[in-house]
Amino acid sequence: MADEKNKPENPDLDQRDINNPRDREALKQAADDFLKARRAEAAADEAEGEVDETANRIAVLEADNTELKDQMLRVAAEMENLRKRTQRDVQDARAYAITNFARDMLSVSDNLRRALDAIPADALEADSNLKSLSEGVEMTERAMLLALERHGVKKLEPEGQKFDPNFHQAMFEVPNPDLPNNTVVQVVQAGYAIGDRVLRPAMVGVSKGGPKVSAENGASTSEDNA
């Protein structure tokens, strides 16, 4: 009895008697609790690892998605640029397809005009057949130029305009103090454009000795003060 009185009410597991059924049950329960705790910790660690792995996969997928979006946007932009470039090339091909042909036809027109100008006026008055022939050639010239105009070929009318090397070719200078310097005063050979391109520059004579036009404000200054 003295031994039982000396036993503590809640003895430690190390002090349990394995041969005592009650102690053996307590030890078993403690072992089960320990295993459950370890399993719970392992499950929590595994779940945390799965969460981290899932988060990493999501981050990778988001990065891939962003890259694919960027690639798709770049492809779309390239396709749009290609579409515009193709459309522009088609428009240019349509507009300028007859460039070489038109240039050759202008040479023919020039020859017709030279032939007409070479016929003396008195010869036309004296010979009705020659006059009829001349009128036929002139009608042919006009019809040719009208046909070219319908296909986008336009005649340049530079007389009285300021000389522009992009559209005009200066052949000579004419002293004229009354006109601003470099004003087109005479057209030797007509120029032509097709679309926004020069098909053939106009050959012109320009004034010299007149007031210059200021590039800043458009005001005229005298040749001596320039």
UniProtKB/Swiss-Prot annotation:
Protein name per its UniProtKB record: Protein GrpE
CDD domains with a match to the protein in the record: GrpE (cd00446)
InterPro entries referenced in this protein's UniProt entry, alphabetically: GrpE, GrpE_coiled_coil, GrpE_head
Keywords from the named record: Chaperone, Cytoplasm, Stress response
Lineage per the UniProt record: Bacteria, Pseudomonadati, Pseudomonadota, Alphaproteobacteria, Hyphomicrobiales
Pfam families: GrpE
Compositional bias (Polar residues): 217-226
Species annotation: Brucella melitensis biotype 1 (strain ATCC 23456 / CCUG 17765 / NCTC 10094 / 16M)
Family statement: Belongs to the GrpE family.
Annotated region described as Disordered, given as residue ranges: 1-24, 205-226
GN (gene name): grpE
